[in-house]
Amino acid sequence: MADRILVARIGAPHGVRGEVRLFVFTEDPGAVLDYDPLTDATGKKRFRIAALRAAKDHFVARIEGIADRTAAEALTNLDLFVPREALPPPDDDDTFYHADLIGLDVVDEAGVVIGKVVALQDFGAGDILEYAPTLPATKAKTLMVPFSKDAVPVVDVPGRRVVVAEAFVERRPAEPEEGEDTGGE
């Protein structure tokens, strides 16, 4: 499991005084202020949020030491993390941090491993499970399925696997044998 958990991402600058858009991933967005300091992915660079206010679909934050737009631009798309031990433990087996899914086996309903989880994406219409397929006939580098009970009926973090419903498994038909009639001209 990851020792640092992604809690926010810095977006584009907001104005000319060093404020930034902040996309918060905690269940309670205001809780991001409770985690001090936040760090980059390496854990070496530290950031403190001096002020936070809600905007339309994000937050606007002032980060200590960032006083102008140029400094704010340098932080665009920076992920902010906290140590796992700073967060409350999940309540039960059905509760987990998204980071806990990275690296889990993706299996079909028959239990055949079809890939490994590489990310959980949110493009605005709900979470999407992204995985790197291991099936030899699959040419895509990654595949995506909705992260819903219909598409992913089982999430077994202790068992290190997620199950993808058959309707969402991409399988390419085998290549036709040489000379086999494929119905084409």
UniProtKB/Swiss-Prot annotation:
Q: What is said about its interaction partners and assembly?
A: Binds ribosomal protein uS19.
Q: Which family does it belong to?
A: Belongs to the RimM family.
Q: What does the record say about domains?
A: The PRC barrel domain binds ribosomal protein uS19.
Q: Which SUPFAM superfamilies match?
A: PRC-barrel domain, Translation proteins
What are the entry keywords?
Chaperone, Cytoplasm, Ribosome biogenesis, rRNA processing
- Which Gene3D superfamilies does the record cross-reference, listed alphabetically? PRC-barrel domain (2.30.30.240), RimM (2.40.30.60)
Q: Which Pfam families match?
A: PRC_RimM, RimM
Q: Which organism is it from?
A: Xanthobacter autotrophicus (strain ATCC BAA-1158 / Py2)
Q: What is this protein called?
A: Ribosome maturation factor RimM
Task: Give the location in the cell.
Answer: Cytoplasm
